[in-house]
Amino acid sequence: MAASASPMASQLRSSFSSASLSQRLAVPKGISGAPFGVSPTKRVSSFTVRAVKSDKTTFQVVQPINGDPFIGSLETPVTSSPLIAWYLSNLPGYRTAVNPLLRGVEVGLAHGFFLVGPFVKAGPLRNTAYAGSAGSLAAAGLVVILSMCLTIYGISSFKEGEPSIAPSLTLTGRKKQPDQLQTADGWAKFTGGFFFGGISGVTWAYFLLYVLDLPYFVK
């Protein structure tokens, strides 16, 4: 009985294993139900995507000045341009080698001279015969108000006898003389120069427009 059962058991075992293998290796079918024809000679290719670090370094357009974020300023193609640096260094407020009094006179002359035109053309008496006088007086009054504001700022920001609060190092680390404008005495000189220059600019504009009677558009 055992001898006759063993061939039957081996036959059943082989049939079960072949059936399970055929189920696992079932040929896939398409949408129409027809099986896909897999050619045994067809080679399937594959590729792998890898992220490779570039050897070329990238440059930031905007970065902290001198690479130090604690300075609180950014270096851009505009602010770090030699042309912009040359222009700013020639403005009166940034010419640290010039006396604060002369810097104030220069700034005041420009403001006083160019303030007359808007007050003459846009003032309340622009359509009367007193437009020139009223506009010049209004410009002079604005110069006085600005001078008072500069005085208030100097009193609240600088203390008498204290050294300049301006930095003594350039952005490249070179030593320089601190700007004397950032002191109480220097700011007082700048304010006085601004007042004198502003009144002089208003007077000069009025003289050119209404004394010499030059053919300017703002008349």
Curated annotation (Swiss-Prot):
Residue ranges that the UniProt entry lists as topological domain Stromal: 51-134, 213-219
Keyword terms, alphabetized: Chloroplast, Membrane, Photosynthesis, Photosystem I, Plastid, Transit peptide, Transmembrane, Transmembrane helix
Subcellular location field: Plastid, Chloroplast membrane
Membrane topology field: Multi-pass membrane protein
Membrane-side (Lumenal) residue stretches: 156-191
Subunit record text: Interacts with CURT1B and PSAO.
PANTHER family: PHOTOSYSTEM I REACTION CENTER SUBUNIT XI, CHLOROPLASTIC
GO biological process, one term: photosynthesis
InterPro entries linked: PSI_PsaL (IPR003757), PSI_PsaL_sf (IPR036592), PSI_suXI (IPR022980)
Molecular function per GO: mRNA binding; protein domain specific binding
Family designation: Belongs to the PsaL family.
Sections of the chain in a coiled coil: none
Protein name: Photosystem I reaction center subunit XI, chloroplastic
Organelle targeting peptide span: 1-50
Alphabetical list of Gene3D superfamilies matching this protein: Photosystem I PsaL, reaction centre subunit XI
Annotated transmembrane regions: 135-155, 192-212
GO cellular component, one term: chloroplast
Keyword Hydrolase part of the UniProt annotation: no
